[in-house]
């Protein structure tokens, strides 16, 4: 199967999980990116079962609305039973690197209030150690260079994310993103806490403190379900 076929496979598997485990009338937390889009497309078929969704980005909001799925602001919702999102990398503990699509801060906020985080990914995203995929850090623009120096001191190579025109990429929150190459993150929780403590960091794209509870992993043999009992 191609990577796109695997994404559609796990998107459907996540919709099936929601149907089986989330009661009718609930609001669903939805992530951002190409794999999350496959989940949205599958969820649209059964949208009448649910009140709507909480979105993690402008792009996701647009896709949800295009399917006629009502979008709630997180402030309008008391709780979320489930949050479904992709990952750029996921390790054996359920810790992830996320933010390749630029929505890491809102993804982390929505994930933090959900009872269950369901990660959907193809098998190429499963890694023994996080860090081969560049680690995104959303930063307040004036702190970009100072944070870059801190990253360099830890052995990382900071690269400012830019658009096709060469201008700094701007997040939905009005900030910039530094992508850090060359890391091997042996202690994701510790590294997440360390980077988040730097002045000017909005959030780092490590999801270890709030890792996945469940991963639906697309493989050549079908969907593999992995449960992370420690999260």
Curated annotation (Swiss-Prot):
E.C. number(s) listed in UniProt: 5.3.1.6
GO molecular function, one term: ribose-5-phosphate isomerase activity
Record GO biological process: D-ribose metabolic process; pentose-phosphate shunt, non-oxidative branch
Binding site for substrate: 32-35, 85-88, 98-101, 125
Reaction it catalyzes: aldehydo-D-ribose 5-phosphate = D-ribulose 5-phosphate
Pathway assigned to this chain's UniProt record: Carbohydrate degradation; pentose phosphate pathway; D-ribose 5-phosphate from D-ribulose 5-phosphate (non-oxidative stage): step 1/1
Pfam families: Rib_5-P_isom_A
Coiled coil residues, start to end: none
Catalytic site: 107
InterPro entries cross-referenced by the UniProt entry: NagB/RpiA_transferase-like (IPR037171), Ribose5P_isomerase_typA_subgr (IPR020672), Ribose5P_isomerase_type_A (IPR004788)
GO cellular component assignments: cytosol
Subunit structure, as described in the record: Homodimer.
Function: Catalyzes the reversible conversion of ribose-5-phosphate to ribulose 5-phosphate.
Family the entry assigns: Belongs to the ribose 5-phosphate isomerase family.
Protein name: Ribose-5-phosphate isomerase A
Gene source species: Burkholderia lata (strain ATCC 17760 / DSM 23089 / LMG 22485 / NCIMB 9086 / R18194 / 383)
